[in-house]
Curated annotation (Swiss-Prot):
One of its GO terms (molecular function) is thiazole synthase activity. The keyword Metal-binding does not apply. Disulfide bonds: none annotated. One of its GO terms (cellular component) is cytoplasm. It catalyses: [ThiS sulfur-carrier protein]-C-terminal-Gly-aminoethanethioate + 2-iminoacetate + 1-deoxy-D-xylulose 5-phosphate = [ThiS sulfur-carrier protein]-C-terminal Gly-Gly + 2-[(2R,5Z)-2-carboxy-4-methylthiazol-5(2H)-ylidene]ethyl phosphate + 2 H2O + H(+). It comes from Brucella suis (strain ATCC 23445 / NCTC 10510). This is Thiazole synthase. CDD domains: ThiG. Belongs to the ThiG family.
Length: 256
């Protein structure tokens, strides 16, 4: 079972809530995905006390855990301020920490990310850092107090899948006891299955579902892919080989 900061979840699929055609389609997608955790941007939704009341009511009705994020923040100070606002609005210590370093690729700023993570962890936040696939950055984030890591598969919204499977596989091997979530770049269910087959604990999907022709159907497809990938990983799949290996035994073969 998936576990984040002492909270346990049946589903290993996290779902973003941005870019859906309508609130009802979002609700249908969340239900179809079987996800129990959704991410919410404070910059887009304003919680109970302001204009986002309808959205907030929808999320509450779905009965899912809320993971606020600091999307759009480019400095540690901005991310920290947003995290504090999110804690007040959404009533949770969870924060998906994003400190963006490049506007073209939306690549995270590793230096600002570690700085902000250290401060937020010291202030009692339970931080989910959106990061690249660098092992040293991962180590620094863990030292800062993060108990979950969220490396990207590819740039946000690109749909490219896993740009560097080797780096992700290495990270999994290096941190066997840390929950790892592939965040960003997933485009189709097979990408999610591939991440799960590498041993990742979960995947976070937004654009690939929200922008699909049928978001609810795509959400269901991702749910099945995540389940299949996890089952495959737990089944201990065979290693790839360069040469053929006969699957049919030669015992009993007729010799002419």
């Amino acid at each position: 079972m998936l576990e984040f900061y002492g909270k346990r979840f049946e589903s290993r699929l996290l779902l973003g809530t941005a870019q859906y055609p309508s609130p009802s389609i979002l609700a249908d997608a969340v239900r179809a995905s079987l996800s129990r955790t959704v991410t919410v941007s404070l910059r887009r939704e304003s919680g109970e006390a302001r204009a986002g009341q309808d959205f907030w009511a929808l999320i509450k009705a779905l009965g899912v855990a809320v993971l606020p994020n600091t999307a759009g923040c480019h400095t540690p100070r901005e991310a920290i301020t947003t995290a504090h606002m999110a804690r007040e609005v959404f009533g949770t210590n969870w924060i998906k920490l994003e400190v963006i370093g490049d506007t073209d690729t939306l690549q995270p700023d590793p230096f600002g990310l570690v700085e902000a993570a250290r401060i937020l962890c010291d202030e009692g936040f339970e931080v989910f850092p959106y990061m690249n696939d660098d092992l040293i950055v991962a180590e620094r984030l863990i030292e800062a107090g993060c108990k979950v890591l969220m490396p990207w598969g590819a740039p946000i919204g690109s749909g490219r899948g896993l740009n560097n499977p080797y780096a992700l596989k290495t990270m999994r091997a290096h941190f066997p006891d840390i929950p790892l979530v592939v965040d960003a770049g997933i485009g189709v269910p097979s990408h999610a299955a591939a991440a799960m087959e590498l041993g990742f604990d979960a995947v976070l999907i937004n654009t690939a579902v929200a922008k699909a022709g049928d978001p609810a159907a795509m959400a269901r497809a991702f749910a099945l892919a995540v389940e299949a990938g996890r089952l495959a990983y737990e089944a201990d799949p065979i290693e790839a080989r360069d040469m053929a290996s006969p699957s049919t035994p030669l015992l009993g073969k007729a010799f002419l």
